[in-house]
Design a protein with these regions (language model features):
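A conserved ligand/cofactor-binding region detector
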Residues: 2-268
Length: 268
């Protein structure tokens, strides 16, 4: 009998599933190099947040971030201020003395960051800390030193003098309640004193060592000295103390830093 043919074996193809290629890892945001302007400004903010205001990144309020940012900018401004005043003293320069009853300073933080060419640096430093410069700057209350065109003109003059490297000092009054707020009560307008110093101001530097005694009232005592010259002396006065506060004024590009000196009255 003929042999039966064995059925041919079916070939089975084994297909192995390929593992999907791993997705490329997301690139981490580049951190500023140690010692870079952004890193230094960021560290200065954190240092003031901790050492000056006893806060950390978790407990800090928006106002704390504003104060710490102002202090970080002020550090750099004061270094230039000291250099400027040392140069003026060594050259025995003549100064312009500008007197005004009001100064409308505007937003001091943003203006100083622009003049010191630190705006981009501060923006990047705050962004690393999870903060936005515009929102932080909104915390700044207007200085109660003036309101109107003449006050704004006086502030612009001080900016211009510093930008032009002209030695100058502005003089004014350290108002405690310079302006007022308007509210409505029972359909009537009510004025309320606006204490702009309630939360302190990081730009003010108290100078008690330059205080002066200011005599008030009294009478004039006339006399003659040994040479027969007539002398007049104010006696029986009531005295007040004038205590100065300085606000550094930076010119554009930080070339010079002059200052505005405001006088506060205190009991003698």
């Amino acid at each position: 009998m003929p042999k039966k043919k064995k059925p041919a074996k079916k070939s089975v193809k084994v297909v192995t599933a390929r593992k999907p290629a791993p997705k490329p890892a997301k690139k981490a945001k580049a951190q500023p190099a140690a010692g870079s302007p952004v890193a230094e400004f960021r560290d200065a903010i954190l240092r003031h947040l901790k050492s000056t205001f006893a806060r950390d990144r978790v407990t800090a309020t928006r106002n704390d971030w504003w104060m710490a940012t102002c202090m970080a900018a002020r550090d750099q401004m004061l270094a230039r201020y000291i250099d400027t005043q040392a140069q003026h003293a060594s050259k025995n320069v003549r100064r312009v003395y500008y007197l005004s009853l009001e100064y409308l300073m505007g937003r001091v933080l943003t203006n100083n960051l622009v003049n010191l060419q630190l705006r981009d640096v501060a923006t990047a430093a705050l962004a690393e800390l999870g903060q936005d410069l515009e929102k932080v700057a909104d915390e700044e209350a207007d200085m109660g030193l003036g309101n109107g065109g003449l006050g704004r003109l006086a502030a612009c003059f001080l900016d211009s003098l510093a930008t032009m490297d002209i030695p100058a000092i502005g003089y004014g009054i350290h108002y405690e309640f310079g302006l007022f707020r308007q509210t409505f009560a029972q359909g009537r307008q009510v004025e309320v004193a606006d204490n702009w110093l309630a939360n302190n101001n990081p730009w003010l530097i108290r100078r008690p060592n330059f205080r002066v005694s200011v005599p008030l009232y009294g009478r004039v005592k006339h006399s003659t000295d040994d040479r027969g010259n007539h002398c007049a002396e104010l006696v029986e006065t009531r005295n007040l103390l004038g205590v100065p506060w300085d606000i550094p004024i930076a010119g554009f590009a930080g070339s010079s830093v002059n200052f505005l000196r405001l006088w506060e009255s205190k009991a003698a």
